[in-house]
Regions:
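Alpha-helical transmembrane segments and adjacent TM-loop junctions that form the membrane-embedded core
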Residues: 1-95
Length: 95
């Protein structure tokens, strides 16, 4: 039976996102467990002036960090320009 990941697992994912300085915010964090597999998907908000390559590299970096925390997970990170979508949780910077 499919179920949402526990709050503790979601907190780990949120901490990974919060710690990445290139992530300005994120939304649509969706998690699922089916049998022994985990599925994690999130939309991140990044600097709209970055190149496609830079955006891809950021997404890859975050996917790898989440996969290190959850080795059995299928992870999808979708980058979007900051300010163009609803943000459920904003990452604050020290600027």
């Amino acid at each position: 039976m499919d179920e949402e990941l526990p709050d503790a697992d979601r907190a780990i994912i949120q901490a990974i996102l919060d710690q990445d300085q290139d992530v300005r915010g994120y939304h649509a964090l969706r998690t699922r467990r089916a049998g022994g597999s985990r599925f994690i998907q999130v939309d991140i908000q990044i600097n709209p002036d970055l190149s496609f390559r830079e955006a891809h590299d950021i997404s890859d970096r975050i996917e790898l960090a989440i996969e290190e925390a959850f080795p059995d997970a299928d992870v999808i990170v979708h980058p979007a320009p900051a300010g163009e979508a609803r943000i459920e949780r904003r990452v604050l910077s020290e600027e």
